Amino acid sequence: MGMNINRRSFFGGLAASVAMTGCKGLLGRGERPMLRLGVISDIHITTPGPESTDKFRTALREFRSLGADAVLVAGDLADWGLRSNLKTVKAVWDEVMGGTDAIPLMITGNHDFDGWRYGDMTLDMHMQGYSEDEALKTLGMKACWEEIFHEPFADIRKRTVKGFDFVSVEWHVDGKEKNDALVAQWLKDHAAELKGDRPFFFFRHSPIPNTVSSSSKDPENALYRALQAFPNCVAFCGHTHRTFFDEGSVWQDGFTAISIPSMEYQGALRGYENGSDHRRGGSKCSMPRMPMQGEHADAQGYFVSVFADRLEIKRLDFAAGEEIEPWTLPWPIAAGKPFAAGERAKVTPVPEFPSDAQVALRVYNADTRGGHWTIFWELTFPRATAEGGRVLDYEVRAEMAADGSVAAVKRFLSPAFHKVEREEPETVRVYFDGMDVPESGRYRLAVYPRNCFGRAGRPIFTRWLESKPGKAKAKGMAQQ
């Protein structure tokens, strides 16, 4: 997970944003960067009130104090996709960045087109006195954008800041979401303008397939394949609300890709007993769910300094008011590719439990997320740590005594995986569904601490167990 060493406070969190004085740039070597860039995504603005705008305002103030030449915002500006949402975005920008030369580099995301029709958001929108009658999609995104931001709008744009090109792609390209094939063709048509030793920045809302840890897998994706021809490309994407404490948020191969966290909330990963639910439900996970989105209300972003031989990327946790250990990408990309997934996996620290760590075990009766009564094993143990790193999750395996085989596996996110490390509780508690352990035979539950690349430290074990806890009773309850 993301390094927390050399962490420092750069302001007193959101509550102190008005009094914030900013922080000195982490420039190193006394050099002045050729470009300073603030990078955020998914600001999800609704109303003009501070509950909706303060996080965006705080980020802009920090970027202003650092002397940003431009601020990149990679989509989902307007949570409900309304004209008034977009006007609020512009008003906050003018309030904070007015009088500077900083250039706004903003694009649309799915919410900017369709947020008004997402069920829970439609209800919230109506309750606060707003209506889909002012939907940007209905009124015309191009007309509204140009009226509000006073700049030309196009599905694909190339803008230049201090000699560096920025290629932006909107959520809809030629009337189709993403439309990667058309974007790929645009890149091929403009290759002569973009290729070279100087980096150029590509940004859109959703991740490019086959890159960062939150991206989808599609080896034949046209955009992914097209960008392989541009080793000088640095691609920024948002959408997934993936915390930057996941070291897989940076990827290098034929080009560089970086996932931008959300300014509204960091999402819980799927595939975990305490992970994310799909918006429409259907989760079959057993453990009590992670806190809902409002309780994940963390705001994170980057400040990028471009030098002749490297990119320095500060990780800024605006909610905690802290700067996390930065990422430094040597330039050109051919200089070792230290952020290639395989290389990162080799050097990212592996978490370990304290030498005297033990697992406490008890039976716990509760309902699963699906509303079915069952019996859990409740496991309690001290948190794992990694020097210069973080624990992402804990893998619990039911290991058989007879042959060492693994009869069942469940994974649990560390309670504060998305927050600064000091927020991690000293004691972790997870729930393993007792109906998934072996029917017979001796077994024990082994707990493995893992980093974001799935590398595990040494496990700790429960006592040896003989059978399912309360199996007969659970079966009887299920049949009633």
Feature map (PLM): residue ranges:
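Active-site neighborhood of phospho(di)ester-bond hydrolases with catalytic His/Asp-centered motifs
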Residues: I40-S41, V71-D76, P104-N110, F202-H205, ...
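Short acidic, glycine-rich surface-loop motifs adjacent to enzyme active sites
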Residues: A191-V212
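N-terminal active-site segment of His-dependent metallophosphoesterases
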Residues: L26-L86
